[in-house]
Amino acid sequence: MNPTDLHPIKERMQAARAAAIADFRQHLRPDPLLSELRRIVDQALRDLLKLCPLPAGATLAAVGGYGRGELYPHSDVDLLILLPRAPDGPDESAIETLVASLWDLGLEPGHSVRTLAECETEASADITVETALLESRWLAGSRSLMKQFETAMTARLDARAFFRAKRVEMQQRHARYQDTPYALEPNSKESPGGLRDLQVILWMARAAGFGRNWRAVAQAGLLTAPEARDLRRAEQAFKRLRIELHLLTRRREDRLLFDLQPTLAEVYGIATTTTRRASELLMQRYYWAARLVTQLNVILIQNIEERLFPRPESDARAIDEEFRSLHGRLDIIREDCFERNPTLLLRAFLVMQQHPGLSGMSARTLRAIWHSRHRIDAQFRRNPVNRKLFLQILQQPRGIVHELRRMTMLNILPRYLPVFRRIVGQMQHDLFHVYTVDQHTLAVIRNLRRFTMPEHASEYPLASQVMAGLDRHWLLYVAALFHDIAKGRGGDHSELGARDARRFAQEHGLAPEDAELVEFLVRQHLLMSAVAQKRDLSDPEVINEFARQVKDERHLNALYLLTVADIRGTSPKVWNAWKGKLLEDLYRLTLAALGGAQDTRTVLAERKEEAARLLRLAGLRDDARDAFWQQLDVAYFLRHDASEIAWHTRHLYYQVQPDKPVVKVRPTEEGSGLQIMVYTRDTPDLFMNTCAYFDGKAFSIQDARIHTTRQGWALDSFIVLPAEPLADLRAQAALVEHELAERLRQAQGGARLADVRVFHRNRQSRVSRVFPVMPQAELHPDERSQSWRLSVTATDRPGLLHALARVMAENGVNLIMAKIMTLGDRVEDVFIISGAVLERPRTQMQFEHAVLDALAGE
């Protein structure tokens, strides 16, 4: 066949598609477009078969979504070529010509060629194949063979086996998507709460004879009319979303990728507000719809299961006058119990906690709660009985996180705490949160709960120890509920959240000291992280100032626990062992300071004495130690702890003026990174060259301390983390010692150093490209010295610190200390610097502009 024979078919098809899409843009109704696209392809296939006929006696059938009568703009065209017998040579040739022509038409066929017996074999082996074949539709060829096929598929269908298989398949699919509809980039088709879940319900219902659409399923008694309406609306919303994704990307794309979300928001007419991005508002709508589907999915599947696998109610066991255990699930005794007594809407969750043998709630209970949620109103919230019940839920020894999640899914928690409703499904495009605000909040509570469990004590030894000594753990859960509750409102979310927490504490009758603790935790929940990661913990004044802010040991314990739980609940990328050590160091230092603040001279003396003790253990004579220490000023001893001072001294006391750079490296104490010491003659570009080396090794600098001895030698210390965990840190340490020393030696010799950055580092994540952080640089004089404090915020990228180091070197700015805080794809770094350009307003402004250019990548 001549390919030019296909041109008229292709042109008619493309013109009809364009007209259908233009019509969709006018009315925005998904079903007419999906049906019209299906009709267009049906006609194109029939036209094609006039040129490329089927083998004699064969049938061409649409299967899968196409067989269902729905075709998305860029979906595969799923076809079954059904043969009456095994194909011979001419049959195979005809099929090859037909399939090649389908590709030439631009249809991207997903095709299979089978006999009737092969269809039955494949359907028995694979539930996905069986499901696709169930949704078959005759297109052309032998109608009698199609009838035989339909009869065979119907005859072999076992509703019970089909239900079990589809439920397992759905559970496996949900697991691939982390069992949550709240993914950052959800798949509108496959993610929990998406289109596939709706299709699974209808497949199960159809196999069991309960109907093919929502109206029929409702008439069969599996759904109420309002539930059917809600599911129909959600289905239409997801269908339109999938259509828009295909049209926007011009390919089969079902994921709401970061770079598509802003454009999709425009398509939907969603505008950015003063406090929320348009993309965040779009995603909140998506999450609300997915939550609805997820909840009704549970109810429907239970209802179908009860119809297919009826069990007697003789095993029901009364729990109290309102609830019973039925088949291991919490069941209501009377249908109208929540309408008669709305307080039971909270007590149901308390009963779940108090009866751990219950595997869940029955469909009847879930449905009754769902439909009675409107009974939680202002009067309900003011009821002292309900307030007491809510606190009891938080005070239980088990099931707190499970029930809070269930309360959120059933819309009970958002109705009881209206301020919580605002954050349900609220995405945070801040480059370090990977959960919606409500899911992050529940993750923080989960982390706090783990601190109370002996089986997790080895994961968080200090946190578990601190939690064991803390009274009234539930106060931490209240603080966690409110710590981010004001996100998206504008203003300081910590301050606004503290006011909400104070109001909650007053309304729920918390003791004054407990109310004050909760309010403090919400207001200061970012404090400990900021001090640990941005301030010099070796400075006694920093510790004393933090101790004054936390006031006492109870506040310190609670803040430490909330901080660790908060960071760990933000993103797997944000937490690392180094941050854990910083927080632990700050906790221990502050605990000591709360026992009595120490002045600088006392701390200095104790630090030197401890370093001297360590050096004696290493066999170093006191006179050798003192000779080296005379090269160092007070600032050095305040900037390093005793272990670091002893380590430096042990390697440098005999080479105070070396003829080449000295580099020593050891694994960090917590075992995740490297501690690096550089000792060499000081030069303006030393820090820049060191950063360039780290950048080339894909090392992330966490901490930098820059010191110059009285004789002009640089003694610099770094903590770096590798991009990926290293199997042998000691081998890496030896390699760095050699390579970095050689690089610095070449630089001092005047050699022009090549850019060693490796190619895979020169990339940014998609989210950071779509939602970049506005570069910021703030320069303030350091209140207790002659130096300056430079605070920068920007999107993280390869070579960022190297670029800043270059700006400092070019402007004659000396780096004294750097504290690097990386939060996912966002950096918040602090540099203590000095230099003549910082003393004059004009040159200071020029320096700030150069820093901003470096942050922006210009």
From Swiss-Prot:
Region annotated Uridylyl-removing, chain positions: 319-674
Record protein name field: Bifunctional uridylyltransferase/uridylyl-removing enzyme
Gene Ontology molecular function: [protein-PII] uridylyltransferase activity; phosphoric diester hydrolase activity
Control of this protein's activity: Uridylyltransferase (UTase) activity is inhibited by glutamine, while glutamine activates uridylyl-removing (UR) activity.
Family label: Belongs to the GlnD family.
The protein's required cofactors: Mg(2+)
Domain HD: 437-559
Keyword annotations of the record: Hydrolase, Magnesium, Multifunctional enzyme, Nucleotidyltransferase, Repeat, Transferase
GO biological process: regulation of nitrogen utilization
NCBIfam families, per database record: PRK03059.1, UTase_glnD
